[in-house]
C-alpha cells in the first residue's frame, strides 16, 4: 500500500461528511465543447491526492458550497480569509460559500510553509488557477445541460445562466451530481512553495474583482483574543509527553557528562542524549 492509498480513505471520509463532490481537470484532455467535458467524468472513482489533480485543491459540495484544500497552515496571519476570497472570486460564488481546509496532509498536498507572511504570495496563486479551471469546466457542463454555447453563459453566486435568460440556469451543485473529473493538471513537478499546476483557464483580470480586496471580518480573531482558540501547543493525545532541548552556551559544544539526578523530582522525566543532542521528556511541563 503506497502513501496515496493510505491517505485516500481519510479524504473520502471528509468529503462524504461534508457532502463534497470533487472537481478535477487538466490540460491534457481537449474540451472543445460539452461532449468532451462529459466524457471526462468517471462516476464513483475518487482521484488520488496528488499535485496534478484539481480535486486536490477544489471540491464543490452538493449544496453549491466549495471546499478549498490549502496545503499550508495559518499561524495567525489570517490567510484563510484571503484564500477564500481568491477561490470565491474565480468561481463566482459568495465568500461565505467557501470553506478553506488547511494543513491536513490527509486532505491537501504539500505547498510548503507560510512563514514571513508569504502564504498567500506563494500558495494563493495555485488555489486561484485551480478555482478558475473548475469554473471553466463547470461552465462547459452547464453548456451541455442547457444546450447553450459556453461563451453565452455567465455565473452569479454559483448559478450558471444564459446571458439573455436568467431563468434558464443550473447550479454548480446540480452540475456535479456525484461524479468526479479525473484529468491531470499541468503540474510543474515541484512541491512546497514552488508548486504550480495550472489548467487551461485564465484567472480573472484584477480590474474585474468584486470580492478580492474587500475588507472581510476575520472570524478567528475573537477566539484568539478570548483564549478559545486551539493552537498546536494545546494539542493533547493519549500517552503524550513533553520535551525540551538542552542547548549549550557555545555553538558547536558537545556534552561530556549529564547529571540525570537533577530531574529526579519530576515524575516520569528522563534524559535523551544522542551524541550532540541533549534533551529531556516528561509527562508534565514544569514552569
Regions found by a protein language model. Give the residues of each.
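Cofactor-binding beta-sheet edge motifs in enzyme active sites
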Residues: 2-31, 36-287
